[in-house]
Protein backbone atom coordinates (compact mmCIF):
# COMPACT_ATOMS: atom_id res chain seq x y z
CA UNK A 1 0.00 0.00 0.00
CA UNK A 2 1.30 3.42 -0.99
CA UNK A 3 0.07 6.80 0.23
CA UNK A 4 -0.52 9.97 -1.78
CA UNK A 5 -1.20 13.46 -0.43
CA UNK A 6 -3.86 15.12 -2.59
CA UNK A 7 -4.34 18.89 -2.82
CA UNK A 8 -7.26 20.70 -4.48
CA UNK A 9 -7.58 24.48 -4.90
CA UNK A 10 -8.87 25.07 -8.43
CA UNK A 11 -12.01 27.05 -7.54
CA UNK A 12 -13.65 27.84 -4.20
CA UNK A 13 -12.95 24.72 -2.13
CA UNK A 14 -9.68 24.33 -0.28
CA UNK A 15 -9.03 20.64 0.28
CA UNK A 16 -6.35 18.18 1.34
CA UNK A 17 -6.54 14.41 1.69
CA UNK A 18 -4.42 11.33 2.21
CA UNK A 19 -5.40 8.46 -0.06
CA UNK A 20 -3.89 4.99 -0.27
CA UNK A 21 -3.56 2.84 -3.36
CA UNK A 22 -5.91 0.28 -1.75
CA UNK A 23 -8.68 2.93 -2.02
CA UNK A 24 -8.59 3.90 1.65
CA UNK A 25 -9.12 7.58 2.43
CA UNK A 26 -6.90 7.96 5.49
CA UNK A 27 -7.95 11.55 6.18
CA UNK A 28 -9.54 14.42 4.31
CA UNK A 29 -10.45 18.01 5.08
CA UNK A 30 -12.34 20.52 2.96
CA UNK A 31 -13.23 24.16 3.53
CA UNK A 32 -15.92 25.79 1.41
CA UNK A 33 -15.95 29.50 0.60
CA UNK A 34 -19.69 29.76 -0.05
CA UNK A 35 -20.25 32.47 2.55
CA UNK A 36 -17.43 34.61 1.19
CA UNK A 37 -18.73 34.50 -2.38
CA UNK A 38 -22.49 34.52 -1.72
CA UNK A 39 -22.80 38.35 -1.65
CA UNK A 40 -21.39 38.45 -5.19
CA UNK A 41 -23.57 35.68 -6.61
CA UNK A 42 -20.54 33.73 -7.80
CA UNK A 43 -16.88 33.03 -7.22
CA UNK A 44 -14.53 36.03 -7.03
CA UNK A 45 -11.06 34.77 -8.07
CA UNK A 46 -9.07 37.11 -5.83
CA UNK A 47 -11.09 36.19 -2.74
CA UNK A 48 -10.76 32.50 -3.57
CA UNK A 49 -6.98 32.63 -4.00
CA UNK A 50 -6.53 34.53 -0.74
CA UNK A 51 -8.61 32.00 1.16
CA UNK A 52 -6.61 29.11 -0.29
CA UNK A 53 -3.37 30.77 0.77
CA UNK A 54 -4.65 31.21 4.32
CA UNK A 55 -6.16 27.75 4.77
CA UNK A 56 -4.10 25.23 2.83
CA UNK A 57 -0.93 24.87 4.93
CA UNK A 58 -2.71 24.29 8.27
CA UNK A 59 -5.16 21.96 6.52
CA UNK A 60 -2.34 19.80 5.18
CA UNK A 61 -0.82 19.60 8.65
CA UNK A 62 -4.21 18.63 10.05
CA UNK A 63 -4.72 15.68 7.69
CA UNK A 64 -1.18 14.47 8.30
CA UNK A 65 -1.71 14.54 12.06
CA UNK A 66 -5.16 12.96 11.84
CA UNK A 67 -3.81 10.02 9.85
CA UNK A 68 -0.65 9.74 11.92
CA UNK A 69 1.44 10.02 8.77
CA UNK A 70 4.81 11.73 8.43
CA UNK A 71 6.02 13.35 5.23
CA UNK A 72 8.63 10.62 4.97
CA UNK A 73 5.79 8.09 4.77
CA UNK A 74 4.33 9.65 1.63
CA UNK A 75 4.94 8.07 -1.75
CA UNK A 76 3.89 11.08 -3.82
CA UNK A 77 2.24 14.49 -3.67
CA UNK A 78 -0.59 15.09 -6.15
CA UNK A 79 -2.08 18.53 -6.75
CA UNK A 80 -4.55 20.03 -9.17
CA UNK A 81 -2.51 21.88 -11.80
CA UNK A 82 -5.49 23.03 -13.89
CA UNK A 83 -7.90 23.82 -15.35
CA UNK A 84 -9.32 26.40 -12.98
CA UNK A 85 -8.85 29.85 -11.51
CA UNK A 86 -5.13 30.36 -12.00
CA UNK A 87 -4.51 32.09 -8.66
CA UNK A 88 -6.01 29.26 -6.66
CA UNK A 89 -4.39 26.57 -8.79
CA UNK A 90 -0.98 28.15 -8.21
CA UNK A 91 -1.47 28.18 -4.43
CA UNK A 92 -2.04 24.43 -4.37
CA UNK A 93 0.58 23.54 -6.94
CA UNK A 94 3.31 25.64 -5.32
CA UNK A 95 2.52 24.06 -1.94
CA UNK A 96 2.77 20.60 -3.48
CA UNK A 97 6.08 21.43 -5.12
CA UNK A 98 7.51 22.69 -1.83
CA UNK A 99 6.51 19.51 0.01
CA UNK A 100 7.79 17.30 -2.81
CA UNK A 101 11.13 19.09 -2.85
CA UNK A 102 11.56 19.13 0.92
CA UNK A 103 10.52 15.49 1.39
CA UNK A 104 12.23 14.19 -1.72
CA UNK A 105 8.99 12.75 -3.09
CA UNK A 106 7.54 12.68 -6.62
CA UNK A 107 5.19 15.43 -7.75
CA UNK A 108 2.12 14.40 -9.74
CA UNK A 109 0.32 17.24 -11.51
CA UNK A 110 -3.35 16.34 -11.86
CA UNK A 111 -5.86 17.61 -14.36
CA UNK A 112 -8.85 18.58 -12.21
CA UNK A 113 -11.18 17.02 -14.76
CA UNK A 114 -9.27 13.76 -14.53
CA UNK A 115 -9.87 13.81 -10.79
CA UNK A 116 -13.61 13.83 -11.49
CA UNK A 117 -13.27 11.30 -14.31
CA UNK A 118 -11.58 8.74 -12.05
CA UNK A 119 -13.43 9.51 -8.80
CA UNK A 120 -15.90 6.64 -9.18
CA UNK A 121 -13.00 4.18 -9.35
CA UNK A 122 -12.00 5.30 -5.86
CA UNK A 123 -15.40 4.31 -4.50
CA UNK A 124 -16.02 1.30 -6.74
CA UNK A 125 -13.25 -1.27 -7.16
CA UNK A 126 -15.29 -3.11 -9.80
CA UNK A 127 -15.42 -0.19 -12.23
CA UNK A 128 -13.05 -1.05 -15.05
CA UNK A 129 -12.07 0.67 -18.28
CA UNK A 130 -13.57 1.54 -20.68
CA UNK A 131 -16.65 3.47 -19.58
CA UNK A 132 -18.72 6.39 -20.78
CA UNK A 133 -18.49 9.51 -18.64
CA UNK A 134 -20.92 12.39 -18.31
CA UNK A 135 -18.92 15.18 -16.68
CA UNK A 136 -21.25 17.92 -15.46
CA UNK A 137 -20.11 20.81 -13.29
CA UNK A 138 -20.14 24.58 -13.01
CA UNK A 139 -17.50 24.98 -15.68
CA UNK A 140 -17.82 21.89 -17.85
CA UNK A 141 -20.38 19.69 -19.57
CA UNK A 142 -18.85 16.87 -21.57
CA UNK A 143 -19.43 13.29 -22.65
CA UNK A 144 -16.23 11.27 -22.84
CA UNK A 145 -15.12 7.71 -23.38
CA UNK A 146 -12.64 6.85 -20.63
CA UNK A 147 -10.33 4.18 -22.03
CA UNK A 148 -7.69 4.32 -19.31
CA UNK A 149 -5.74 6.69 -17.08
CA UNK A 150 -4.80 9.60 -19.30
CA UNK A 151 -6.80 8.15 -22.20
CA UNK A 152 -9.92 10.24 -22.78
CA UNK A 153 -11.88 10.62 -26.00
CA UNK A 154 -14.26 13.55 -26.00
CA UNK A 155 -17.53 12.75 -27.71
CA UNK A 156 -19.48 15.91 -26.87
CA UNK A 157 -19.10 19.23 -25.08
CA UNK A 158 -21.10 22.41 -24.58
CA UNK A 159 -21.03 25.07 -27.27
CA UNK A 160 -21.76 27.82 -24.73
CA UNK A 161 -22.58 27.41 -21.03
CA UNK A 162 -22.02 24.49 -18.67
CA UNK A 163 -25.03 22.91 -16.98
CA UNK A 164 -23.83 23.90 -13.51
CA UNK A 165 -23.60 27.49 -14.67
CA UNK A 166 -27.18 27.26 -15.93
CA UNK A 167 -28.31 25.99 -12.53
CA UNK A 168 -26.52 28.87 -10.79
CA UNK A 169 -28.02 31.43 -13.17
CA UNK A 170 -31.50 29.99 -12.67
CA UNK A 171 -31.03 30.21 -8.91
CA UNK A 172 -29.98 33.84 -9.22
CA UNK A 173 -33.02 34.65 -11.39
CA UNK A 174 -35.30 33.04 -8.81
CA UNK A 175 -33.56 34.80 -5.91
CA UNK A 176 -32.26 31.58 -4.37
CA UNK A 177 -28.69 32.69 -3.78
CA UNK A 178 -25.36 30.90 -4.24
CA UNK A 179 -24.53 28.05 -4.70
CA UNK A 180 -27.53 27.56 -6.92
CA UNK A 181 -27.62 23.88 -7.82
CA UNK A 182 -28.86 22.48 -4.51
CA UNK A 183 -31.30 25.39 -4.08
CA UNK A 184 -32.90 24.85 -7.49
CA UNK A 185 -33.16 21.10 -6.90
CA UNK A 186 -34.84 21.66 -3.53
CA UNK A 187 -37.36 24.19 -4.90
CA UNK A 188 -38.12 21.96 -7.89
CA UNK A 189 -39.51 19.27 -5.59
CA UNK A 190 -42.52 21.53 -4.94
CA UNK A 191 -43.10 22.40 -8.59
CA UNK A 192 -44.74 21.01 -11.72
CA UNK A 193 -42.09 20.05 -14.27
CA UNK A 194 -44.59 20.44 -17.12
CA UNK A 195 -45.98 23.83 -16.08
CA UNK A 196 -43.56 26.11 -17.93
CA UNK A 197 -42.84 25.58 -21.65
CA UNK A 198 -39.06 25.83 -21.80
CA UNK A 199 -36.85 25.01 -24.82
CA UNK A 200 -34.61 21.96 -25.12
CA UNK A 201 -31.63 23.37 -27.05
CA UNK A 202 -29.99 20.97 -29.54
CA UNK A 203 -32.72 18.37 -28.97
CA UNK A 204 -32.88 16.14 -32.03
CA UNK A 205 -29.67 17.53 -33.52
CA UNK A 206 -27.33 15.04 -35.18
CA UNK A 207 -24.45 16.84 -33.50
CA UNK A 208 -23.94 15.45 -29.97
CA UNK A 209 -23.05 18.74 -28.27
CA UNK A 210 -24.87 20.63 -25.50
CA UNK A 211 -26.19 24.18 -25.35
CA UNK A 212 -27.74 25.83 -22.30
CA UNK A 213 -27.55 29.58 -23.01
CA UNK A 214 -31.01 29.63 -24.61
CA UNK A 215 -32.49 27.70 -21.71
CA UNK A 216 -31.11 30.27 -19.25
CA UNK A 217 -32.65 33.09 -21.27
CA UNK A 218 -36.00 31.31 -21.35
CA UNK A 219 -35.95 30.94 -17.57
CA UNK A 220 -35.39 34.70 -17.26
CA UNK A 221 -38.32 35.43 -19.58
CA UNK A 222 -40.56 33.03 -17.64
CA UNK A 223 -39.70 34.79 -14.38
CA UNK A 224 -40.17 38.28 -15.83
CA UNK A 225 -43.58 37.35 -17.26
CA UNK A 226 -45.01 36.91 -13.78
CA UNK A 227 -47.18 34.05 -15.08
CA UNK A 228 -45.48 31.20 -13.25
CA UNK A 229 -44.66 30.10 -9.73
CA UNK A 230 -40.96 29.93 -8.92
CA UNK A 231 -41.21 26.25 -7.99
CA UNK A 232 -42.75 25.47 -11.37
CA UNK A 233 -39.97 27.36 -13.15
CA UNK A 234 -37.33 25.44 -11.17
CA UNK A 235 -38.97 22.08 -11.85
CA UNK A 236 -39.47 22.83 -15.55
CA UNK A 237 -35.88 24.00 -15.91
CA UNK A 238 -34.58 20.86 -14.24
CA UNK A 239 -36.73 18.64 -16.47
CA UNK A 240 -35.53 20.48 -19.58
CA UNK A 241 -31.95 19.88 -18.47
CA UNK A 242 -32.65 16.17 -17.97
CA UNK A 243 -34.26 15.88 -21.41
CA UNK A 244 -31.24 17.56 -23.01
CA UNK A 245 -28.79 15.28 -21.20
CA UNK A 246 -30.55 12.07 -22.20
CA UNK A 247 -30.95 13.15 -25.82
CA UNK A 248 -27.28 14.15 -26.10
CA UNK A 249 -26.15 10.86 -24.52
CA UNK A 250 -28.24 8.94 -27.04
CA UNK A 251 -26.63 10.80 -29.95
CA UNK A 252 -23.08 10.61 -28.56
CA UNK A 253 -23.16 6.98 -27.47
CA UNK A 254 -25.94 5.51 -29.61
CA UNK A 255 -25.23 2.54 -31.81
CA UNK A 256 -24.98 -1.21 -31.63
CA UNK A 257 -22.07 -1.24 -29.19
CA UNK A 258 -22.90 0.63 -25.97
CA UNK A 259 -20.09 1.04 -23.40
CA UNK A 260 -20.36 -1.41 -20.48
CA UNK A 261 -20.88 1.37 -17.93
CA UNK A 262 -22.17 4.94 -17.73
CA UNK A 263 -20.51 7.10 -15.07
CA UNK A 264 -21.58 10.57 -13.98
CA UNK A 265 -19.18 12.94 -12.22
CA UNK A 266 -18.84 16.58 -11.23
CA UNK A 267 -20.82 18.83 -8.93
CA UNK A 268 -24.09 18.50 -10.86
CA UNK A 269 -23.82 14.71 -10.42
CA UNK A 270 -25.13 15.27 -6.89
CA UNK A 271 -28.57 16.15 -8.32
CA UNK A 272 -30.86 13.24 -7.46
CA UNK A 273 -33.31 13.85 -10.33
CA UNK A 274 -30.48 13.74 -12.86
CA UNK A 275 -29.03 10.62 -11.22
CA UNK A 276 -32.36 8.82 -11.38
CA UNK A 277 -32.82 9.70 -15.05
CA UNK A 278 -29.32 8.50 -15.90
CA UNK A 279 -29.84 5.27 -14.00
CA UNK A 280 -32.97 4.58 -16.04
CA UNK A 281 -31.20 5.49 -19.28
CA UNK A 282 -28.38 3.07 -18.50
CA UNK A 283 -30.70 0.26 -17.42
CA UNK A 284 -32.70 0.51 -20.64
CA UNK A 285 -29.48 -0.06 -22.59
CA UNK A 286 -28.02 -2.80 -20.36
CA UNK A 287 -25.29 -0.48 -19.13
CA UNK A 288 -24.10 -0.42 -15.56
CA UNK A 289 -24.69 2.98 -13.93
CA UNK A 290 -22.08 4.31 -11.52
CA UNK A 291 -22.19 7.57 -9.57
CA UNK A 292 -19.66 8.56 -6.91
CA UNK A 293 -20.77 9.24 -3.34
CA UNK A 294 -22.06 12.78 -2.89
CA UNK A 295 -18.87 13.78 -1.06
CA UNK A 296 -16.86 12.95 -4.18
CA UNK A 297 -19.11 14.89 -6.58
CA UNK A 298 -18.13 18.40 -5.57
CA UNK A 299 -14.50 19.50 -5.67
CA UNK A 300 -12.42 17.55 -3.15
CA UNK A 301 -8.87 16.39 -2.56
CA UNK A 302 -9.64 12.69 -2.21
CA UNK A 303 -10.32 12.44 -5.94
CA UNK A 304 -7.06 14.28 -6.65
CA UNK A 305 -5.18 11.94 -4.34
CA UNK A 306 -6.80 8.94 -6.03
CA UNK A 307 -5.88 10.22 -9.50
CA UNK A 308 -2.37 10.51 -8.09
CA UNK A 309 -2.55 6.88 -6.94
CA UNK A 310 -3.64 5.79 -10.41
CA UNK A 311 -0.73 7.63 -12.01
CA UNK A 312 1.72 6.49 -9.34
CA UNK A 313 0.88 2.87 -10.18
CA UNK A 314 1.80 3.67 -13.78
CA UNK A 315 5.01 5.42 -12.65
CA UNK A 316 3.82 8.72 -14.10
CA UNK A 317 5.13 11.74 -12.23
CA UNK A 318 6.02 15.28 -13.25
CA UNK A 319 8.97 17.67 -13.01
CA UNK A 320 9.00 20.30 -10.29
CA UNK A 321 8.87 23.04 -12.92
CA UNK A 322 5.45 21.89 -14.16
CA UNK A 323 3.40 25.03 -14.75
CA UNK A 324 -0.21 25.66 -13.75
CA UNK A 325 -2.67 25.54 -16.62
CA UNK A 326 -5.85 27.65 -16.55
CA UNK A 327 -7.08 25.60 -19.54
CA UNK A 328 -6.27 21.91 -19.90
CA UNK A 329 -8.58 19.70 -21.99
CA UNK A 330 -8.77 16.02 -21.15
CA UNK A 331 -8.72 15.20 -24.85
CA UNK A 332 -6.21 17.53 -26.53
CA UNK A 333 -6.84 15.83 -29.87
CA UNK A 334 -10.55 16.66 -29.93
CA UNK A 335 -11.72 18.85 -32.78
CA UNK A 336 -12.49 22.44 -31.74
CA UNK A 337 -16.17 23.20 -31.19
CA UNK A 338 -17.58 26.72 -31.35
CA UNK A 339 -17.54 28.22 -27.86
CA UNK A 340 -16.38 25.01 -26.24
CA UNK A 341 -12.77 25.88 -25.45
CA UNK A 342 -13.53 28.75 -23.13
CA UNK A 343 -13.14 26.98 -19.79
CA UNK A 344 -11.15 23.83 -20.45
Curated annotation (Swiss-Prot):
Reactions listed under catalytic activity: L-threonylcarbamoyladenylate + adenosine(37) in tRNA = N(6)-L-threonylcarbamoyladenosine(37) in tRNA + AMP + H(+)
Pfam families referenced in this protein's UniProt entry, alphabetically: TsaD
**Record-linked SUPFAM superfamilies:** Actin-like ATPase domain
Give the CDD domains listed for this entry.
Answer: ASKHA_NBD_TsaD_bac
Gene Ontology MF annotations: iron ion binding; N(6)-L-threonylcarbamoyladenine synthase activity
Annotated GO biological processes are: tRNA threonylcarbamoyladenosine modification
| Binding annotation for Fe cation | 112, 116, 299
Per UniProt, the keywords (alphabetical) are: Acyltransferase, Cytoplasm, Iron, Metal-binding, Transferase, tRNA processing
Localization in the cell:
Cytoplasm
Enzyme Commission number, as recorded: 2.3.1.234
Reply yes or no: does the keyword Transmembrane helix apply: no
Q: Its domain of life? A: Bacteria
User: What is the UniProt remark on how the cofactor binds and its stoichiometry?
Assistant: Binds 1 Fe(2+) ion per subunit.
Cofactors (names): Fe(2+)
User: Which family does the similarity line name?
Assistant: Belongs to the KAE1 / TsaD family.
Write out the function statement from the record. Answer: Required for the formation of a threonylcarbamoyl group on adenosine at position 37 (t(6)A37) in tRNAs that read codons beginning with adenine. Is involved in the transfer of the threonylcarbamoyl moiety of threonylcarbamoyl-AMP (TC-AMP) to the N6 group of A37, together with TsaE and TsaB. TsaD likely plays a direct catalytic role in this reaction.
Put simply, this protein is called tRNA N6-adenosine threonylcarbamoyltransferase
Q: Which gene encodes it?
A: tsaD
